[in-house]
Curated annotation (Swiss-Prot):
Family indicated by similarity: Belongs to the porin LamB (TC 1.B.3) family.
Source lineage: Bacteria, Pseudomonadati, Pseudomonadota, Gammaproteobacteria, Enterobacterales
Keyword tags: Cell outer membrane, Ion transport, Membrane, Porin, Signal, Transmembrane, Transmembrane beta strand, Transport
Compartment annotation: Cell outer membrane
Gene it is expressed from: bglH
Matches recorded under InterPro entries: G_neg_Bact_CarbUptk_Porin, LamB-type_porin_N_dom, Porin_LamB, Porin_LamB_sf
GO MF term set: carbohydrate transmembrane transporter activity; porin activity
Ranges of compositional bias, category Polar residues: 62-73
Subunit and interaction comment: Homomonomer; no physical evidence of a homotrimer has been found, however conductance experiments suggest it may be a homotrimer. The monomer probably consists of 18 antiparallel beta-strands.
Species, as recorded: Escherichia coli (strain K12)
Region forming the signal peptide: 1-25
GO cellular component entries: cell outer membrane; pore complex
Region (Disordered): 52-82
Role: Part of a cryptic operon that is poorly expressed in vivo. May be an ancestral sugar porin with a broad carbohydrate specificity; it binds aromatic beta-D-glucosides such as arbutin and salicin, but with low affinity compared to the binding of maltooligosaccharides to the LamB porin.
Protein name: Cryptic outer membrane porin BglH
Amino acid sequence: MFRRNLITSAILLMAPLAFSAQSLAESLTVEQRLELLEKALRETQSELKKYKDEEKKKYTPATVNRSVSTNDQGYAANPFPTSSAAKPDAVLVKNEEKNASETGSIYSSMTLKDFSKFVKDEIGFSYNGYYRSGWGTASHGSPKSWAIGSLGRFGNEYSGWFDLQLKQRVYNENGKRVDAVVMMDGNVGQQYSTGWFGDNAGGENYMQFSDMYVTTKGFLPFAPEADFWVGKHGAPKIEIQMLDWKTQRTDAAAGVGLENWKVGPGKIDIALVREDVDDYDRSLQNKQQINTNTIDLRYKDIPLWDKATLMVSGRYVTANESASEKDNQDNNGYYDWKDTWMFGTSLTQKFDKGGFNEFSFLVANNSIASNFGRYAGASPFTTFNGRYYGDHTGGTAVRLTSQGEAYIGDHFIVANAIVYSFGNDIYSYETGAHSDFESIRAVVRPAYIWDQYNQTGVELGYFTQQNKDANSNKFNESGYKTTLFHTFKVNTSMLTSRPEIRFYATYIKALENELDGFTFEDNKDDQFAVGAQAEIWW
């Protein structure tokens, strides 16, 4: 473009000379003609230099005056360090057309970040996700995870879990908005190089559509600010992140719900969802589908004092059984369905220097109580790996949890996850009906903060659980884990900042295994593993 401008300019400047030369050709001598040509050439060169300088100014960023400094060797330091593809601080956008009576520029400045957000909001599409992946090896062959839900995740997980969410705004006018949301989740195997979905040897490669729903705002006169949704979606999950299970979880095949409905000082989440289960017979070989429905109600974000909020929650699951399904339970050895519930409360305290702690109290009965008694994954499911079975007799279980992180000075941070549980007369998936249990699990993760991007620390985990069956026989399960790690981060928070890359060395030992009989490779009761793992969400 610049060369073309130069050539055009030269032609325009030489054109008058050509006309004048033709008109004077008959009266000028050769010397006079040469003199005129030299003069015109000098003028052309001057004009070309002017255009060249103007072009340079267009592409040279403005700089501020500064003194020239020297480095330790006495050389002048470059006051204008080079950078590639530097982003402008702002962009100009055209405002709405002004009336004749209005004054001022029709353009205004907008930061590049705001402009990017404007474009994203205008398109109405977002892509969010999460995944983890990594490499590890162990002292006795292939590394194995054990009791992640009690001993902690660092250096103890070898899966490639992912969540991918697509959201598209389809309407946004007159105070009403409609969005379509689809979420996929699953696992990509970390053992073999091929990871075809459906080639599920070892249970590693699988995927599902966990969410597919429409969410709206502004359609309910009594709750215009709330999110009203219909489709395959459940109530929001609340996770004990260091243990990789949920204190609040309501899975759904389909449902209808309302979130963030402002009522009084807090907000209400309410969901009515369907979650059918496979009801098994006592041989665990035959099954029948039972339609169940769940009501999940939460009153959240209730202010208590400075930076403290309270949530109160309740959940009830009931079955809508056909006559043939009831007959199978009465006469053909299928387990009876028993309605199940969970109630509780949680308190979240944020700290002035960053960090938080969340305390929760939960009580449940029947099949949800059975899942309170699991030492590995302890989310409040109504089934065990999707199967409903067991003689549930109305027994109850209680769970107290603490999780959070706190900064100690400028260079230390510690995260925690502590759970105490007990239950009476529950169905245990390890020790059967009319079981009692008591368990405690504790994981702490202190680290030294080198800077915003580096931390070095240790994750220490210990748990012990005792079950007592209907005959008062006792079964114990316990173990501990020590993980040394260094992480590359983008912020100092352990629980709320990602991406994160970890390098770790882990020693894990099973002290007692009377509930599951677990062993590592070569029938060992311990394992030393090293590896690296990446975890990211966006």
